[in-house]
């Protein structure tokens, strides 16, 4: 073998070795997605463990010490910022409610946010409350919190509870999550800010719509009828959509409409379930009227970052 031929053979072998040692872009992409999925599951575990320890374990101080960050920004209007605010505000409620039980029904995560729906009761047989929470997690600690709370009424316009139905779904591509999130926001914008409930339903609600809001019957027609009188709203009075959390077939949306007096207004946290065509087929929510002042000085919807 000549020297040039040997050199060529050596270069070819080195090239092959380098190619085999360099991860392909698809392998790298899969690894990144897996790491992101692991982080989302870790964040969900932090939040659910915190919730269980504080509310069902009744160990409020221990939950705060273990899971809350050095900076904890509170948007629940009755509690102050910080772990101390959580312990004094929420701890007092837990202590005064010996029969308290919180059943977590749905948990979703996206980015650094974890959204949670639960059914909280104060005694056996109590209708209880629908509680929707959003937590922001940073380096394994909870650093910010928003919520919406609604009493479960005695009667409902539909045969469903505020909590039943599917609780999870297979994971979806980022493109599907982005599409469903955009559709949820467009639906709310059309219905509540533009006064176009019929258009919102025609474009974005599937032929079968299961409703868990106790004020509405099942189906798109009931929704359109209930919102038929809404006038377009702009400016400061328009409904805001501060944050969303999408996972699987579900999109969790926070809303807030100011009344114009301090921090007062009406807000909700909604869960929409979508079909494969990006149409809404199921809906859960909690709706709350918020006061004009808060214990923390924060609004119930803004972002402390």
Stretches found by the model and what they are:
Residues 16-305:
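C-terminal and inter-domain tail/linker signature
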